From Swiss-Prot:
GO terms for molecular function: ribosome binding; rRNA binding; translation initiation factor activity. Keywords: Cytoplasm, Initiation factor, Protein biosynthesis, RNA-binding, rRNA-binding. PROSITE patterns: S1_IF1_TYPE. SUPFAM superfamilies: Nucleic acid-binding proteins. Component of the 30S ribosomal translation pre-initiation complex which assembles on the 30S ribosome in the order IF-2 and IF-3, IF-1 and N-formylmethionyl-tRNA(fMet); mRNA recruitment can occur at any time during PIC assembly. Residues 1-72 form the S1-like domain. The gene is infA. GO terms for cellular component: cytosol. This is Translation initiation factor IF-1. Pfam families: eIF-1a. Its main location: cytoplasm. It comes from Marinobacter nauticus (strain ATCC 700491 / DSM 11845 / VT8) (Marinobacter aquaeolei). It is found in: Cytoplasm. InterPro entries: NA-bd_OB-fold, RNA-binding_domain_S1_IF1, S1_domain, TIF_IF1. Belongs to the IF-1 family.
């Protein structure tokens, strides 16, 4: 997937799901299911409910995404 095809949005973690999946409420009110990116998983970045995150979405499926950044 090319970087230019990605839609990047801010959101808040609402719920933790099994297998490192999270339910994220985006700034526009939509709720998506997102998983942690490989670099965050490799560096053991912990994500908890209530954390502000940056999510990448593809234009093909706007209900799933990838968490690429956790704000402090």
């Amino acid at each position: 997937m090319a970087k230019s095809d990605v839609i990047e949005m801010e959101g808040v973690i609402v719920d933790t799901l099994p297998n490192t999946m999270f339910r994220v409420e985006l700034s526009n009110g939509h709720v998506v299911t997102a998983h942690i990116s490989g670099k965050m998983r490799k560096n053991y970045i912990r994500i908890l409910t209530g954390d502000k995150v940056k999510v990448e979405l593809t234009p093909y499926d706007l209900s799933k995404g990838r968490i690429v950044y956790r704000a402090r």
